[in-house]
Amino acid sequence: MGNKINPTGFRLGITQEHRSKWFATSKTYPTLLQEDDKIRTFIQKKYSSAGISDVLIARKADQLELELKTARPGVIVGRQGSGIEELRSGIQKTIGDRTRQVRINVVEVERVDADAYLLAEYIAQQLEKRVAFRRTIRMALQRAQRAGVLGLKVQVGGRLNGAEIARTEWTREGRVPLHTLRAEVDYALREANTTYGVLGIKVWVFKGEVLPKEEQTIPVGAIPRRKGSRKPQQFEDRSNENS
């Protein structure tokens, strides 16, 4: 079952958290669910060059809280936070409510090459530039190894290198335990639009195992970080708190 099911949904409540956190009645649930989809689509389309890994949404009363995990936070924040205001107005326009309070928190991804979505996006960009898929996968594996991941699996399907018959090929480096629930497996699905058609890209990244008592990911054989290492940047928007 671990080979077929979505790794994120399989581990919800164990090592993975829900991307949307809110409660709604049966009448308002469809509307809020559609809002979440519109918000994520708008952000991914507007900031396609910002390397956005994930968009977390939380709702409290009439307040909407967003957490954007990105590889390039400066692209979103802009000069003196002007990008945050532009993003807020765009979200309010997307959901059709100009009075909705929107709080935005931008978090920098600490290890870009260890993030499944960013790796899948990198592979898609290379394939759209007509780079050979085997070379692209090999480069992605090397980047992930330098980032210190314990295992990586990449699968690409479609008309590879312009072949007449579509096929699927995959490769794996290290351990990727799909059946182990305590294993923290980051998963992403991406599409690459090439001149020969659409290629599907799937990436699994194994980062370690979460122990039940400590609730911490402890990579096997990982080198501990130095105390003086650089911390990821975090930009929190508090402009709506006084309103």
UniProtKB/Swiss-Prot annotation:
UniProt cross-references to SUPFAM superfamilies, sorted A to Z: Prokaryotic type KH domain (KH-domain type II), Ribosomal protein S3 C-terminal domain
Explain the purpose of this protein. Answer: Binds the lower part of the 30S subunit head. Binds mRNA in the 70S ribosome, positioning it for translation.
Q: Which residues form the KH type-2 domain?
A: 39-110
Q: Spell out the molecular function terms from Gene Ontology.
A: mRNA binding; rRNA binding; structural constituent of ribosome
Point to the regions of Basic and acidic residues compositional bias.
233-243
Family, per entry = Belongs to the universal ribosomal protein uS3 family.
Question: Which region ranges are annotated with the description Disordered?
Answer: 221-243
Its protein name is Small ribosomal subunit protein uS3
Matching HAMAP family:
Ribosomal_uS3_B (MF_01309_B)
One Pfam family matching this protein: Ribosomal_S3_C
| Domain of life, source organism | Bacteria
| PANTHER family (UniProt xref) | 30S/40S RIBOSOMAL PROTEIN S3, SMALL RIBOSOMAL SUBUNIT PROTEIN US3C
